[in-house]
Amino acid sequence: MDLRQFLMCLSLCTAFALSKPTEKKDRVHHEPQLSDKVHNDAQNFDYDHDAFLGAEEAKSFDQLTPEESKERLGKIVSKIDDDKDGFVTVDELKGWIKFAQKRWIHEDVERQWKGHDLNEDGLVSWEEYKNATYGYVLDDPDPDDGFNYKQMMVRDERRFKMADKDGDLIATKEEFTAFLHPEEYDYMKDIVVQETMEDIDKNADGFIDLEEYIGDMYSHDGNADEPEWVKTEREQFVEFRDKNRDGKMDKEETKDWILPSDYDHAEAEARHLVYESDQNKDGKLTKEEIVDKYDLFVGSQATDFGEALVRHDEF
């Protein structure tokens, strides 16, 4: 096995290698927390800072003077105002908050983009992705590595075609993001459900029964008793997952399980920020209204810590 094959196998095996038989595998795609801080504006605005900027970027604003914070906040506002009409709406603010919280996704896409846009034309074709990902292992397969690369490639191609909205087999940056992180896009959620069901549905009848459901998240270790969480999951399946009580989950029931429609924290925070900053109560914010409430959005220190501090200038 050459180095490329080894690295590919390593990446595929990592999740399995780190798992223990009694550990629970979580199939549910959770929305990330906006902040791990308590949301109490009467004490401080730390939660709002984390939500608006992302936790790491919020730390960099703590190093700035009020004047510097206002200047950088003004630049951010221009980016939030998508339609450039001079106002920031709840929807635009919600979109920004979601972007700030999911910046790691964009960083992952940028990293992978460089390795797959082989001709550097600002697009990634299916052929480029296939050659970069599967070229070596398909040309010289190792029968002992335990992976069916042709099957994996077929599955990747199906997902790529789903992400590729115009059907030209060439992905833009946005389409490539949908391919790599389909759970983040509404139009990709069916493929997330389909792939999940294919993984779990061992008898290929198009449903997930109780034993398949438990078998996916728990590997029985010899004669050991089942952990309590496994018993709880059995109860969850019967009481909540299998909504029509037919002993198995269909596509809709599986979708409700792995892609729950939880409370939208980003929208709640966006509405809160608009409510607190909207001086003329027209339901949207101007740059001036946002900068006037800079302490709510980004905060700052009252003093300049000097040149010794390393400041991040992503914005």
From Swiss-Prot:
<feature type="binding site">
    <location>
        <position position="244"/>
    </location>
    <ligand>
        <name>Ca(2+) 5</name>
    </ligand>
</feature>
<feature type="modified residue" description="N6-acetyllysine">
    <location>
        <position position="165"/>
    </location>
</feature>
<dbReference type="GO" id="GO:0033018">
    <property type="term" value="C:sarcoplasmic reticulum lumen"/>
</dbReference>
<dbReference type="InterPro" id="IPR011992">
    <property type="entry name" value="EF-hand-dom_pair"/>
</dbReference>
<keyword id="KW-0703">Sarcoplasmic reticulum</keyword>
<feature type="binding site">
    <location>
        <position position="121"/>
    </location>
    <ligand>
        <name>Ca(2+) 2</name>
    </ligand>
</feature>
<feature type="binding site">
    <location>
        <position position="282"/>
    </location>
    <ligand>
        <name>Ca(2+) 6</name>
    </ligand>
</feature>
<feature type="binding site">
    <location>
        <position position="253"/>
    </location>
    <ligand>
        <name>Ca(2+) 5</name>
    </ligand>
</feature>
<feature type="domain" description="EF-hand 1">
    <location>
        <begin position="68"/>
        <end position="103"/>
    </location>
</feature>
<keyword id="KW-0325">Glycoprotein</keyword>
<dbReference type="GO" id="GO:0005794">
    <property type="term" value="C:Golgi apparatus"/>
</dbReference>
<keyword id="KW-0677">Repeat</keyword>
<feature type="binding site">
    <location>
        <position position="92"/>
    </location>
    <ligand>
        <name>Ca(2+) 1</name>
    </ligand>
</feature>
<feature type="binding site">
    <location>
        <position position="81"/>
    </location>
    <ligand>
        <name>Ca(2+) 1</name>
    </ligand>
</feature>
<feature type="modified residue" description="Phosphothreonine">
    <location>
        <position position="254"/>
    </location>
</feature>
<feature type="binding site">
    <location>
        <position position="85"/>
    </location>
    <ligand>
        <name>Ca(2+) 1</name>
    </ligand>
</feature>
<feature type="domain" description="EF-hand 3">
    <location>
        <begin position="151"/>
        <end position="186"/>
    </location>
</feature>
<keyword id="KW-0106">Calcium</keyword>
<feature type="binding site">
    <location>
        <position position="205"/>
    </location>
    <ligand>
        <name>Ca(2+) 4</name>
    </ligand>
</feature>
<keyword id="KW-0479">Metal-binding</keyword>
<keyword id="KW-0472">Membrane</keyword>
<dbReference type="GO" id="GO:0005789">
    <property type="term" value="C:endoplasmic reticulum membrane"/>
</dbReference>
<feature type="binding site">
    <location>
        <position position="278"/>
    </location>
    <ligand>
        <name>Ca(2+) 6</name>
    </ligand>
</feature>
<feature type="modified residue" description="Phosphothreonine">
    <location>
        <position position="65"/>
    </location>
</feature>
<feature type="binding site">
    <location>
        <position position="203"/>
    </location>
    <ligand>
        <name>Ca(2+) 4</name>
    </ligand>
</feature>
<feature type="modified residue" description="Phosphoserine">
    <location>
        <position position="69"/>
    </location>
</feature>
<feature type="binding site">
    <location>
        <position position="117"/>
    </location>
    <ligand>
        <name>Ca(2+) 2</name>
    </ligand>
</feature>
<feature type="short sequence motif" description="Prevents secretion from ER">
    <location>
        <begin position="312"/>
        <end position="315"/>
    </location>
</feature>
<keyword id="KW-0256">Endoplasmic reticulum</keyword>
<dbReference type="GO" id="GO:0005788">
    <property type="term" value="C:endoplasmic reticulum lumen"/>
</dbReference>
<feature type="binding site">
    <location>
        <position position="164"/>
    </location>
    <ligand>
        <name>Ca(2+) 3</name>
    </ligand>
</feature>
<keyword id="KW-0964">Secreted</keyword>
<feature type="binding site">
    <location>
        <position position="83"/>
    </location>
    <ligand>
        <name>Ca(2+) 1</name>
    </ligand>
</feature>
<feature type="binding site">
    <location>
        <position position="128"/>
    </location>
    <ligand>
        <name>Ca(2+) 2</name>
    </ligand>
</feature>
<dbReference type="Pfam" id="PF13202">
    <property type="entry name" value="EF-hand_5"/>
</dbReference>
<dbReference type="GO" id="GO:0005509">
    <property type="term" value="F:calcium ion binding"/>
</dbReference>
<feature type="domain" description="EF-hand 4">
    <location>
        <begin position="188"/>
        <end position="223"/>
    </location>
</feature>
<comment type="subunit">
    <text>Interacts with GGCX.</text>
</comment>
<keyword id="KW-0732">Signal</keyword>
<dbReference type="GO" id="GO:0005783">
    <property type="term" value="C:endoplasmic reticulum"/>
</dbReference>
<feature type="binding site">
    <location>
        <position position="280"/>
    </location>
    <ligand>
        <name>Ca(2+) 6</name>
    </ligand>
</feature>
<feature type="domain" description="EF-hand 5">
    <location>
        <begin position="229"/>
        <end position="264"/>
    </location>
</feature>
